Amino acid sequence: MINDIKKDAEARMKKTVEALGINFNKIRTGRAHPSILDGVSVSYYGSDTPLSQVANISVLDARTLSLSPWEKSMVPEIEKAIMKSDLGLNPVTTGELIRVPMPALTEESRKGYIKQAKTEAEQARVSIRNVRRDVLADVKELLKEKEISEDDDRRAQDDIQKITDKYVAEVDAALAVKEKDLMEI
């Protein structure tokens, strides 16, 4: 019973850390990475479609993305969608190929992105702590119903705290890596 609760807590905390990684990938570092364009949607036959579903996105070099639309007619639409996004990118079209150079980050924009990363990390920590709170409430409920002893309750609390500390440390490590990435010139 307690093991199921601990496994559930660990799974939920792991999902939080994975979601943080996805959010960190969306923060621009000045280096080209296909996930930067994840939030960009293109009008495709009247419906908004993610860019990755209408074009092949690849990294040309450290500072340039290359997009190959699957339909020639989509080139202007894709270009327009990238310009409209709030990413500050200006695509360059050469025939059927769209190149997206990554502008160098200014000191001010780096600090803004670091602040955004810290906010994302803090939200992940809060989410992990909320999972801990919910799980500890479940354990207390078992104790109240006399399904576990006080010793089991104490042991479960200690184990859950260790799991929480482990995932908070993972969040801190991910934040440190992202900050280092952002400060590289």
Curated annotation (Swiss-Prot):
One Pfam family in the UniProt entry: RRF
Keyword match ATP-binding: no
Record-level GO cellular component terms: cytosol
Cellular localization per UniProt: Cytoplasm
Gene symbol of the encoding locus: frr
Keyword Glycosyltransferase belongs to the record: no
Superkingdom of origin organism: Bacteria
UniProt keyword list: Cytoplasm, Protein biosynthesis
Record GO terms (molecular function): ribosomal large subunit binding
Record-linked Gene3D superfamilies: 3.30.1360.40, Ribosome-recycling factor (1.10.132.20)
Organism listed in the record: Teredinibacter turnerae (strain ATCC 39867 / T7901)
Name by which UniProt lists this protein: Ribosome-recycling factor
